[in-house]
A protein has these predicted regions:
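Polybasic/polar functional segments that serve as interface/processing modules
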Residues: 2-290
Length: 293
């Protein structure tokens, strides 16, 4: 029978140096590290936009602010932080709204002779060179595949409720790595990259590796909670709860911002233009929306 541990507070917080030492302390392995580590990071930004015009303006603002080009820069920073090498970038802005980016990565630099010819190695993003047809070089023949290997993806979902004046912006980020790379040390950067009212994180480890004596290991680093890898200052502004299944190497943390400062949730509107009673009603509506997201 699986044991599930649920906590309302942070479990065993370590300082940043201790966190880094966990990631840097390596087992002596036999052959390739076959562990797959996957971090799913979901954030919700919530806004009060009363009129239909305000709702559409909010969606347009979010859609432009977090377009595929900016998201690509965020993922490239994540790739750099985990010490990986870009093999291929695929990005797209959608109509009427939303964007996605997919970055195929390798654990270390690969000889170009061994990189599949369909991979663009990030050239459409890094290079502005145009071919004879006016397209960015290599962009028109990009193929993105091998999603069972190490990759980083992001998808955005802006939307608004037609009745209760609440608009939301959801971002889904997945960092999946094979080998020695762990995505956990990117958490603080990802939290800072978005206006995060609600954060849901899932981390799991699959497969096994062996040490030099042949003993199996189902994890190559210590972890009791995802919160161990988040800075204390960030944890103070959120209520956090864990649901962890240690035997299966499954870790889940949900964080909800503690204080709602109404001005931060209004779109193109000043809080002092709203009557006190209505302010309270809006605040309660925002809180209910957060709790049911």
């Amino acid at each position: 029978r699986f044991l599930t541990k649920i906590t309302n507070t942070k479990i065993g917080t370590n300082c940043e140096k201790e966190v880094m030492s966990k990631l840097e302390s390596k087992l002596k392995l036999y052959g390739f590290n076959n562990l797959t580590k996957t971090l799913s990071f979901n954030i919700y930004d919530i806004c009060y936009a009363k009129t239909e015009r305000e709702q559409k303006d909010y969606i347009a603002y979010i859609d432009e602010h977090y377009n595929s080009e900016r998201l690509t820069k965020i993922l490239l920073k994540v790739t750099d932080m985990i010490g990986a090498q870009v093999l291929n970038i695929s990005k797209q802005d959608y109509e009427p709204q939303g964007a996605s980016v997919n970055v195929l990565i390798a654990e270390e630099r690969i000889d170009l002779n061994f990189v599949d010819s369909s991979c663009n190695k990030g050239k459409p993003f890094f290079s502005g060179d145009l071919d004879s047809e006016g397209e960015t070089a290599h962009e028109h023949r990009t193929v993105h595949a091998h999603l069972d290997k190490s990759h980083v993806t992001v998808h955005t979902f802006p939307e608004y409720h037609p009745d209760n004046s609440i608009s939301t912006f959801r971002v889904d980020i997945d960092v999946s790595t094979c080998g020695e790379i762990s995505p956990l040390n990117t958490l603080n950067y990802l939290i800072d990259s978005f206006d995060s009212d609600i954060i849901t994180m899932d981390y799991r480890i699959r497969g096994f590796t062996r040490d030099l004596s042949g003993k199996k290991f189902f994890s190559d680093h210590n972890i009791t909670s995802i919160q161990d890898y988040i800075e204390k200052d960030k944890l103070r502004i959120y209520d956090a709860i864990d649901v962890n299944v240690y035997q299966s190497n499954i870790f889940h943390t949900k964080m909800l911002i503690k204080d709602i400062k109404l001005q931060n949730y209004l779109f193109n509107q000043d809080v002092y233009e709203i009557a006190p009673q209505e302010r309270l009603e809006i605040t309660n509506r925002l809180r209910r929306s957060e709790e049911h997201t």
